[in-house]
Amino acid sequence: MSLKDILTLIAVTAALVAAEPSAFADKLEEIIQSGVIKIAVPADFPPFGSVGKDGQAEGYDVEVAKLVARDLGVKLELVAVTSPNRIAYLLTGKVDLVISSLGANPERAKVIAFTDAYAPFYLGIFGDAKTEVKSAADLAGKTIGVTRGTIEDAELTRLAPKTATIQRFEDNDPTLSALASGKVDLIATGSAAAGSLARKSPGKAEKKFVLRDSPAHIGVRKDEPDLVAWLNVFIHYHQKPGGELDALAQKWLGESLAGLPPF
């Protein structure tokens, strides 16, 4: 029996046991029968997802999406999204999954379901090495850039002093560019994005302090437990040391998935 057969059998069996008699037409089976899966990936958030020099999508999330499609035995359609629109694309049926460095929080959990974590990630405040900031209190009087609708946006809004100015951008590229060009004093963003900027512009994206640990999860519509179950099997099967997810994480993120908590 192939890996795809094993993963499919486990998930379908679990879903059927819990399903109502009228609910046998589940999403996992629908995807397999259609032969196509549409997955949202970031277009502006390296190393998770961006457009390469050849014009093609590349990054950790892109390769995870390819691995999902391969194990399901279906054709992959990648759909480029930004942080503000990725959940809307899922809820309106434009995509089947969101693999876009998506952090989980109670507010998002009201409208979508999450798998176990598939990538390490933390959110922080970053800025020029010459800017002295060690805590939220030090943000007073500073201008901080952040991508609208992200978890770091919510955390920054909660923690920033009243005298801080929060400048919001519609996606990640302008947020990073604002720091690189000096339009803002600091940015709130993910560790991977800040690392990408630091490699291009040494000294521009020094970590000041951590806002919160926020591992990435795959987003799925609610009431699709069969698909969530299959994806969790997929994640745990491939994240073990030497597994394909672990290898991708080391390639793109420079980190192993060993010890990654499920949530």
Which positions does each model-derived feature cover?
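Bilobed "Venus flytrap"/periplasmic-binding protein-like clamshell domains
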Residues: 38-47, 57-71, 124-170, 186, ...
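Bacterial N-terminal signal peptides
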Residues: 8-19
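Short helix-initiation/N-cap motifs at beta->coil->alpha
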Residues: 77-88, 167-177, 181, 214
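A ligand-binding cleft/hinge motif common to bilobed small-molecule-binding domains
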Residues: 85, 101-110, 155-158, 180-212
